[in-house]
A protein has these predicted regions:
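Short, acidic/turn-prone active-site loops that include or flank metal/cofactor-
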Residues: 96-100, 217-218, 335-336
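Switch I (effector-binding) loop of TRAFAC-class P-loop GTPase G-domains
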Residues: 181-187, 205-233, 249-257
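Conserved C-terminal guanine-recognition region of P-loop GTPase G domains, centered on the G4
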Residues: 23-27, 59-60, 76-86, 256-328
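Switch I (G2) and immediately adjacent beta-strands of P-loop GTPase domains
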Residues: 44-51, 55, 218-246
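N-terminal accessory targeting/assembly segments
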Residues: 1-101, 403-404, 408
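Flexible beta-alpha connector loops of hexameric P-loop NTPases
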Residues: 13-15, 45-47, 210, 241-251, ...
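Short alpha-helix plus adjacent loop in nuclease-associated cores
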Residues: 98-116
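C-terminal-of-GTPase-core extension/linker across diverse P-loop GTPases
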Residues: 2-8, 125-197, 203, 293-408
Length: 408
């Protein structure tokens, strides 16, 4: 296997800038061999994004280390990319392009592939005219000989492709609505959180399944829905694409239906990697809540602080005390070692806003329905009738009691 050597560069506005070189490294390592990371604190330079002196310094490092690709943690304009590639004499991409390449690698289903293509085209659209302008100057490979008419044709071609993909995704969304309608009789729990927080491992722990969980970012792009085991109620849990800082609006839009599948549930499990540095946990919690707010998530939340097996009591107290304002119904668990998983299941039940109803009936169809669709708490046989106490969603309890009242 040929290793492609990468150099990582990040420009920060100031020391308080929350952009993370560690996160960029974690992303890059999915596809490349990282040879070095470099940070510069300064205001953005219109020509290079970073300062010209820093560019010269990095050019020498690229040559000396035989670097194949330079990856920026900042969004680059086509002109900046061209200027940097001219100086480094290797390919230059930014963080968004890197994420799109990772998405492309992991997109296995038709929907995921369409979502990735949509994100790629929406990334390309505002850059199209500038890329063609460079081509007209003979400075952009693959775009030679473009006139004004061709520029507009290229731009309109991208817009048509975007429209076509959106139509295809809309049809898939309608199919998803049908599936969701079928599942409405079940309680639903969504797994959300920063990429690589351990959502898939938690899914396995709660469902008793063994979906492959890699220690790598963005391995889950499609939704996976399973039934939680060890609970009498039929509760479905859905895992989907992880969140990330600096995700542009077009990327959230491309994966909106997938994100909504997890976010619009009766209950949300917001999964956090508790083993990380306290500042990193805070940064990711802020991102999580920002994205949930963007998609107008109104669901009840349990904050699941995963990987508790890697931290001590002091760290647990530090998290609870310093990050209290971000923690909604917190619980420490280890999905890997099943620590506090049963306690989490109880919390799930307690936070589903369920109601309890009691009916007296001798109707076998109703009895069968209750056993299939609700959680039976008690069933007492008396005078050839069943006095059944059951638990379900409040609207379902009210509906069952109303129907039973009409029948009697």
């Amino acid at each position: 296997m040929i290793l492609i050597k990468a150099l990582l560069v990040l420009r920060k506005d100031n020391k308080k800038d929350r952009k993370s070189i560690e996160e960029l490294k974690e992303l890059a390592e999915v596809l490349y061999e990282v040879e070095g990371t470099y940070i510069q604190i300064r205001k953005p330079d219109s020509k290079y994004q970073i300062g010209e002196g820093f560019v010269k310094k990095l050019s020498k490092i690229v040559k000396d280390k035989n670097i194949d690709i330079v990856i920026f943690g900042n969004t680059l304009t086509p002109t900046q990319k061209y200027n940097l590639a001219k100086e480094f004499k290797v390919e230059v991409i930014d963080k968004i392009e890197l994420v799109l390449r990772i998405f492309s690698k992991h997109a296995k289903t038709k929907e995921a592939q369409l979502q990735v293509k949509l994100a790629e085209l929406q990334y390309e659209l505002p850059r199209a005219k500038e890329k063609v302008r460079l081509a007209k100057q003979g400075e952009q490979p693959g775009f030679g000989g473009y006139g004004d008419y061709e520029v507009e044709k290229y731009y309109q071609k991208i817009k048509r492709e975007i429209k076509s993909i959106k139509n295809k995704l809309e049809k898939l969304k309608e199919h998803r609505k049908i599936l969701r309608k079928r599942r409405e009789k079940y309680d639903s729990v969504g797994l959300v959180g920063y990429t690589n927080a351990g959502k898939t491992s938690l899914l396995n722990a709660l469902t008793g399944e063994n979906k492959e969980a890699k220690n790598q970012v963005f391995t889950t792009l499609t939704t996976t829905t399973r039934r939680i085991r060890g609970i009498k109620r039929k509760i479905l849990i859905t895992d989907t694409v992880g969140f990330m800082d600096d995700l542009p609006p077009f990327m959230i839009e491309a994966f909106l239906s997938t994100i909504e599948e997890s976010a619009n549930n009766d209950l949300i499990l917001l999964v956090v990697d508790a083993s990380e540095d306290i500042k990193e946990i805070e940064r990711k919690l802020i991102v999580n809540h920002e994205i949930l707010e963007k998609i107008n998530c109104k669901s009840q939340i349990i904050t699941v602080l995963n990987k508790v097996d890697k931290i001590d009591e002091k760290k647990k107290l530090e998290i609870l005390n310093e990050l209290d304002r971000y923690l909604i119904n917190p619980i420490f668990v280890s999905a890997k070692y099943n620590i506090n998983i049963e306690k989490l299941k109880k919390m799930i039940l307690d936070n589903l806003n369920l109601s309890i109803g009691t009916i007296e009936t001798d109707n076998p169809k109703l009895i069968s329905y209750l056993y299939e669709n609700t959680e039976i708490l008690e069933d007492i046989e008396e005078n050839d009738k069943h006095i059944i106490t059951f638990r379900a969603k409040e609207k379902d309890v009210n509906r069952i009691l109303k129907i039973h009242k009409i029948e009697t």
